[in-house]
């Protein structure tokens, strides 16, 4: 009996620090891009890639850059964990499970908006029938962005595309506390 109690106590000691570490890794963000109550952090990945912009004519006939799609690799430390791409934006795990933007993203300016793309809260849904690690993801936050803004100079020709390098940290959330 005492041996079982010791095993349970040891398990609790080992679990509580892990739970508090997961909780402490949830970032502080502007309230408008906070994840709704009742959701928990599942994954955190660093993204490295480009934001692809395309030259289009605006309503006044001038050329502007418009975001076409992201193209990035997701990393868990040094391990490639997936990809972020397409329009509407999609995130695909190494196991083939995939989520896609399912509603309007909510945006908040990055701390240095002149250099860095905004922070986002994106509702997502499963995009495939593949059961995998993204199967239960319902929100993704894009935070800690660096770079990625459209070029400062106006485009010269309709249809021109350019990739603007960026980095970000993506936080994946599922239902449950």
Regions of interest found by a model, annotated:
Residues 1-8:
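Bacterial N-terminal signal peptides that target proteins for export
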Residues 8-17:
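Bacterial N-terminal signal peptides
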Residues 18-22:
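Sec/Tat signal peptide C-region and signal peptidase I cleavage site
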Residues 23-52, 59-177:
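Primary mode marks residue(s) on the alpha4-beta5-alpha5 output face of response regulator receiver
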């Amino acid at each position: 009996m005492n041996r079982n109690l010791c095993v349970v106590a040891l398990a609790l000691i080992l679990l509580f620090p892990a739970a508090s570490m997961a909780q402490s890794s949830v970032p502080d963000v502007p309230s408008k891009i906070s994840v709704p109550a009742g959701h928990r952090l599942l994954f955190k990945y660093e993204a490295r890639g480009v934001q692809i912009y395309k030259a289009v004519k605006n309503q006044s006939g001038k050329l502007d850059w418009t975001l076409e799609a992201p193209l990035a690799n997701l990393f868990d430390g040094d391990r490639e964990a997936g990809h972020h791409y397409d329009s509407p934006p999609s995130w695909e795990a190494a196991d083939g499970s995939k989520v896609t933007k399912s509603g309007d993203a909510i945006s908040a300016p990055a701390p240095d908006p002149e250099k860095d793309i905004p922070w986002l809260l994106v509702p997502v849904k499963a995009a495939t029938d593949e059961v995998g690690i993204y199967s239960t993801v319902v929100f993704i936050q894009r935070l800690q962005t660096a770079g990625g803004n459209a070029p400062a100079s106006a485009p010269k020709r309709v249809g021109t595309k350019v990739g603007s390098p960026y980095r970000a940290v993506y936080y994946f959330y599922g239902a449950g506390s």
